[in-house]
A protein has these predicted regions:
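Positively charged N-terminal leader segments that act as targeting/secretion signals
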Residues: 2-16, 20
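Divalent metal-dependent hydrolysis catalytic cores, especially in the metallo-beta-lactamase
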Residues: 54-56, 63-92, 115-122, 148-149, ...
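Mid-to-C-terminal alpha-helical segments outside catalytic/metal-binding sites
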Residues: 9-12, 27-76, 266, 270-278, ...
Length: 326
């Protein structure tokens, strides 16, 4: 599908006109200055993402994502590894990588400079017998500067995050100071198993590996109370607010679902640790301009800079060396 970007911009402009005058002034003031790091998106060339992107008003292409970044002052993005065809080098289970710009080149990085990646884990293929060799597979990429973390997919993969088959990867994460992002909460597939994706399971791993940073992706949606408690209790646990919505939510959706966002706000305020929250989109799932606006209503204005930018630099520490003066 060919996206008409002029029409898309008109739709966004109409959306902003509907906002209160004070909100318009705030958006204009922040939009001109505030840098954004998207701490959770996908950069995966797969047929299903074409439909997902179209529903959000986009194309699932590298060019489209770059235009989104230019329009929204997104200076860096963390892409979650999704590919399944990475060859094995050491007899272990290879990681999942990214490939939207081109098939991944593990010798000369051929994805955009403003995108880093988390190594995706195929947990159900790892055993206690091959876990050590799997860690070697991951270490090959962990030595590369564009690798900024590790991503585990409980729920989509019927394995708990704290399962001992993951322990060599946690040791690797500790050695290379890489955070471990963990899918939690709702899944896009009815074949998934929700019990593996409950945010309370992250507490087990975080307590066993206190020197490793863990990220509760999607704030455990809809288990916000549990997710914020785990982050409040564990100094090494953080939260991203990616993927809470999909398609083009718009202001009408926000108004109709205000109770949902109020509930989220209650638990974020209960936690009271705005330094532990990161912006993420889960692109191509959602329209970026609308999602940024809605999360600005959830996170207090005085914490926008750390939420949209600074906290990701702390959690995904390698980003600092990849920003190229952006």
């Amino acid at each position: 599908m060919q996206i008409d970007y002029n029409q898309s911009c008109l739709r966004r402009a109409f959306f902003i006109v509907l906002l209160p005058a004070d909100d318009i002034m705030l958006l204009l003031k922040e939009g001109a200055a505030m840098k954004i790091i998207d701490a959770h998106m996908h950069y995966f060339n797969i047929e299903g993402f074409k439909t997902v992107a179209a529903n959000a008003g986009y194309e699932n292409t590298a060019a489209c994502w770059q235009q989104i970044c230019d329009e929204n002052n997104i200076v860096f993005s963390v892409a979650m590894g999704n590919t399944e065809d990475v060859p094995s080098r050491y007899g272990g289970i290879s990681p999942r990588l990214i490939d939207l710009n081109a098939p991944f080149d593990d010798v000369k990085y051929n994805q955009p400079d403003n995108i880093g990646y988390c190594l995706g884990v195929k947990s159900e293929q790892i055993t206690l017998e091959n876990a050590g060799k799997t860690a070697l597979e991951f270490e090959y990429y962990a030595q590369k500067p564009q690798c900024v973390g590790i991503k585990i997919y409980p729920g989509y993969r019927p394995v708990y995050v704290y399962d001992k088959r993951h322990w060599p990867l946690f040791e690797l994460a500790r050695a290379y100071n890489l955070p471990v992002a963990v899918h939690t909460g709702d899944t896009a597939s009815s074949d998934a198993r929700l019990k593996y994706a409950h945010p309370l399971t992250v507490d087990e791993a975080a307590a066993d590996f206190p020197d490793v940073k863990f990220v509760i992706c999607h704030c455990g949606n809809p288990w916000f109370a549990d997710a914020t408690e785990v982050a409040a209790k564990n100094p090494n646990v953080y939260i991203d607010l990616s993927g809470l919505l999909e398609s083009i939510p718009g202001l009408d959706f926000y108004n109709k679902q205000k109770a949902y966002f109020d509930y989220l706000s209650i638990w974020l305020n209960y936690m009271g640790r705005w330094d532990k929250l990161m912006y993420g989109s889960d692109w191509p799932l959602v329209n970026i301009a609308d999602y940024i606006y809605i999360l600005k209503q959830v996170v207090p204005q005085e914490h926008h800079e750390e939420f949209f930018y600074g906290n990701a630099l702390n959690v995904y520490g390698r980003i600092k060396n990849l920003l190229h003066d952006c």
